[in-house]
């Protein structure tokens, strides 16, 4: 299948306010001669109270989720519903913080014949599974140097192929948003017959842009990790773990800093560590001031 014939299958999720991201990803896709459709992402703060009552559960609204997370989940679910009602058999869905390389669509085009093969029964194929649980249990098929199989604990919805059958399964299981959509997909993978695949090598790259799910935060830690190009570690530290009343976010970095502060007060008694933690916590929370 040529890239021109894939245009109706390729969707990029992008918030209207994130014009810089759209410009960057448009340039990247044009460089690789890939046509796509833009999906105007659902902005969580704009969803109605009626939508929240019908589609977001109590724990999510009060303890686990923020508006960005709810909007992200709503955007993906809307595209899954659109796929089911379309004539297409699969969608290739990208969030706007990814980057293609010269081999991305060469490999994607070679994946497509496997989507209709009952031997593999693919529901969902993650194109950028980079978290620490993404190792595949065993190789089921190979394309060039890329080995494909079912991962142990995959996360991320930054880029993936989903079949119509897979979209039906996800929507049957995810009636209400309860947490990050990639965690919900992970639970479905564990407790159902949902066939989730990924590869041993990322097919697209995650950029080091600020997350649009959590609130933007400039800290010494984030500046240092950006300088080192530790993109996934930075994303992991800044992703919100839980949120109080959709606003006050607690992420991994905050928890680690609080633990460091406790350890320092009990054992190390180091003034530099103390003031470093205080400064980082201030930078993390100045958005609320």
Model-derived segments and their meaning:
Residues 2-94, 98-289:
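An acidic/histidine-cluster motif and surrounding catalytic segment
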